Design a protein with these regions (language model features):
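Secretory targeting signatures
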Residues: 1-17
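Short, surface-exposed ligand- or partner-binding patches at beta-edge/loop junctions that are enriched
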Residues: 83
């Protein structure tokens, strides 16, 4: 009985790792030059933005981006570059903006890779 219980616990632990969901990966952009009229959007929290953000970036947290982007009078054809800490929230923002009709949204991934892409 003890061995069966141990086997069940080991199997449960192994299967728990299998159902954790897909791993997120973000491919950084290479050598980005912001075109005139493009908008650089930091989709992190206010606290993260206050600690560090890219020059020229505006803060619009990812969970409220579709509510706040119209306040910036952004044309739906404008180019929007979004970034966060790792690229995950920026990807959520990109999908939300695409669903709202914005088609030129580019995920710069995390702030470090975005900074590097813009500096090249």
């Amino acid at each position: 009985m003890r061995n069966v219980l141990l086997l069940v616990l080991v199997a449960a632990a192994l299967f728990a790792g299998c159902i954790s969901g897909p791993k997120f990966t973000c491919t950084p952009q290479r050598s980005v030059t912001l075109p005139k009229g493009a908008l650089l959007v930091d989709v992190r929290t206010q606290k993260e933005y206050d600690e560090k953000h890219l020059d020229g970036a505006i803060l619009i947290p990812h969970d409220s981006i579709t509510n706040h982007i119209p306040g910036f009078s952004v044309n739906r054809n404008a180019i929007l570059y979004v970034y966060c800490g790792t690229g995950r929230r920026a990807e959520k923002a990109l999908k939300a903006l695409n669903s709202a009709g914005y088609r030129n949204v580019i995920n710069l991934c995390g702030i470090k890779s975005a900074e590097k892409s813009l500096a090249e």
